[in-house]
Amino acid sequence: MADPRRRFRNKKRDEACSGLLAPVTIARREDAARMMQPKILLKKDRDREQETWDRERDKDRKLERDREAEPSPSCYPDTPPALKTMIVNRTGEVRPADRCQMPLAGGALVQGSGQLSAVPSSSVCAALVSSVPTSRDKGSCSGGAGTAGTSAGAPNALQELQPPRMNRPTPLIVANGIFNANARKLFHKTNTDFTVIGVLGGQSSGKSTLLNLLAAERSLDYDYYQHLFSPEADECIFATRHKLKPNNGQKSILRPRTETLQFFITRERHILLDTPPLMPVGKDSDHQDLYSLGTMAQLLSVCHILILVIDGLALEQLRLINAALRLRPTLHCKGYVRDHMPQVVFVRARAHRIDFEIQQRERLDKKLAYLYGPTGLPIYRGRGDARCLNTFLLPEVSSNKATAFHSCLGELVRQFRERILGCTRISMCHTSTELSEAIWFEILAESARKAAPHFEKIYAEIKLRHLDTRCQWRSDNWRTFSSNAES
């Protein structure tokens, strides 16, 4: 009786031991993600491992097709995704379009070496990335071809690069002669296709009105007189009315419309510079010339096209131009052309009927060529037999209708825009240096910083050497003569 029991007990013990050595597979997950061990691939191992790569890639593709054909619900959402061995280049020799920003744990961005690919390439180092990119990776990688966030983030990136569009002029010189450095954000950093147009003239000569004609392109049937020329003009970019300044409760005093240098950028990226009047009324006589010289020297240094508004022949304006050309400061900017001079256009505003006659226009051109020719300014347009003085006549109008001596106002504005915008744009930088709007703004800031102190220093030296010495010499001679007469 004991022997059968002993044999049964020994048999049961032997079966338990054999069960530990040979486990039985009960179930297997067919839809589980296939894990691959990461490994480092060198360039010399590429040929040897090519067949292995192809087989594994075919298996992965077949497995993905099977999953798409027969999807099965997963009971394990925390299962990590499959890892693939990716090839990146050890060196920095990669195209700019393939550069990628990789996010770190702290939220910082680090420039990647190149575009990640599942196909082995001729690079040296290998890196590991997830086969299923997350939303964070899509938003952070801007150079990968497979990311979905690239197309969505491209318009936002372009909008950030574009400067805000202007709807009114902005002053460049604020109170106390301080340069407005905050205007830098209104200029494009990389745009090189722009034109700088400045205007100079006396008080109430029509400088702001001319810039209003260049600020926007309008149709021929546009009511220019009602919106831009009349006293009730309501669509002027640059102010054309006098400002009222109260005088201790008494009657108001008319102030100039433009009191400081200001600019406006059009949709076509034309930078329009409006200036205060030359030789303004009410300024101190000692600083009147210095104020005008600083503004004129600044525009001669930073403009492509300069409009000189003339009302007859102003010899004071010619004297200031000669002084500004000879005494303007040297700008030490990289690539800037020394002694740069813009293309000059003479505009006769409020011209009368007699000014449109052929003999009168030829006489005016000869006078301007004789006076402004020695300055060296480019005042001509055309070449060969078509070379003539660059002048334009704008009549004094009271409506949009045409008269016996000029066309309608819409046609005159069209001709004026073609004349100004069609002028030769003289470059202010060498050919090897591309002048962008941001670089031009730095040149403008440098000229504004040097112009006013430069002319004040010259005036102080002239006054010390000539004016003060002459007064002292006269007083000394008078005293000497009076003492000799008494003796």
From Swiss-Prot:
Residues 30-83, 136-164 are annotated as: Disordered. The keyword rRNA processing does not apply. Belongs to the SMG9 family. Residues 42-70 have a biased composition (Basic and acidic residues). Involved in nonsense-mediated decay (NMD) of mRNAs containing premature stop codons. Probable component of kinase complex containing nonC and recruited to stalled ribosomes. SUPFAM superfamilies: P-loop containing nucleoside triphosphate hydrolases. GO terms for biological process: gravitaxis; nuclear-transcribed mRNA catabolic process, nonsense-mediated decay. Keywords: Nonsense-mediated mRNA decay. The keyword Transport does not apply. InterPro entries: P-loop_NTPase, SMG9. This is Protein SMG9. It comes from the Eukaryota.
